C-alpha cells in the first residue's frame, strides 16, 4: 500500500505533502517532497518526533545501556517527570510490542535481542535525517487542512476507521466524518483518503 500512496503523490505534481493523521510517519519518511507537514493528536507520537529532532544523541545514548527484556518493557509503561525519558520509553515499548501498540511485549525465541536494539538505533538515525526538516503539528484535522490548504498541497488522510471501537486513542464521530468529507470537497489542493468501507462511509 505504501508504494501506491507514494506513486499517487508523485503523480499529483504537488510539492507539499501533509500527513493529517501521521501515526508512525511512514508516509512522510518515504515521500519525496519539498515540504513535509506531520500531524497527530497523540502527544506521545508528536513528542517522540520532536525529541529525536532536538536530542537525537541523548536518545541513542540511552539505547547503549538498554536491554531487551519483558521486565523493562513493563517498567517503561510508567510515566516520569522527564520528557526525554518518557519519549524514550514510548519508543522502546512500540518497537518491542505486538503491532507497535506499546501494550504487549512481543517475544520470539528466534529474535536476536541485541539485533533488536541495533534496529532501534537505525530507526532513530533514519527518522532524524528526514524529520529535522519537517513541520510538526498537533491539530484537529479541520484546523490543519484549513491552515495548509493551497493549490500546491497534497493531503494524505488515514483516519481512525469508522465504527471500529477500542483500537484508537482518538476516535472520530459520525459528524467528524461528515465534516471531513465536506471540507475535502472544497480544498484547493488534492487529497488521498484511506478509510474502511461500510454503509455509513458509502
Residue ranges and their predicted role:
Residues 7-12, 53-156, 160-166, 179, ...:
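SAM-dependent nucleic-acid methyltransferase catalytic core
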Residues 167-171:
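Short, solvent-exposed loop/turn segments at secondary-structure boundaries
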Residues 189-194:
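Conserved beta-strand signature within the Rossmann-like core of class I S-adenosyl-L-methionine
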